[in-house]
Amino acid sequence: MNNQSFNNFSQVNSNSSFFADKPKNLQNTNLEMTNGTNPPSSFSKQTPQKRQSFGTNTNFSKGNSSRGSTSNKRKVLSVSQILARVNQKKQRKLEQKKRKKPLKPIIPPKSFILLFKDKPEKYVYNRRIIDYKHCGLLQRYIGLGGKILPRRQTKLTAKQQRYVAKTIKSARIMGLLPFVTKERSFFR
């Protein structure tokens, strides 16, 4: 509600018979209350006091009314509070990674070709099956320098790690994967 419209309302009502009995000082206190200052303790005429602000930059001009009721206060945080926030963010990221279970690659069985020949209508390429043609999966197990990542980083079993290393080497020989660095499309 605008202060101007409230002041106009109080001026209109001050002409009525109800407000005629009240002293003028009481009407001044009403105006002071609408202006945002503290009302005086007695009805004697006092000058409005300015509010003191310590360390905060509050601006009550009409130009700020378009932003809404947001204030321009900045919080000063201690080092322990900053570290606590950083730790909370790290924990949230770890929880999100735990929720997103990484695809564990599957070593194809020896009778893999027979499975596809028996049921051609169910020929759906499983994204997790390790294959020299599946470059997107193999790129996960190659470091930035082009080296095959160790088991500690890939979190694969020993058998899976050997199979991944063998398929990466065969994909490199066939020209599907680079020897030195990762493909440019991986970074997009």
Swiss-Prot record:
UniProt keyword Transmembrane, yes or no: no
Main location: plastid
Keyword tags: Chloroplast, Plastid, Ribonucleoprotein, Ribosomal protein, RNA-binding, rRNA-binding
Biological processes per GO annotation: translation
GO cellular component: chloroplast; mitochondrial small ribosomal subunit
Localisation: Plastid, Chloroplast
Region spans: Disordered: 1-79
NCBIfam families named in the record: S18
Similarity field: Belongs to the bacterial ribosomal protein bS18 family.
Quaternary data: Part of the 30S ribosomal subunit.
Name the record gives this protein: Small ribosomal subunit protein bS18c
Gene: rps18
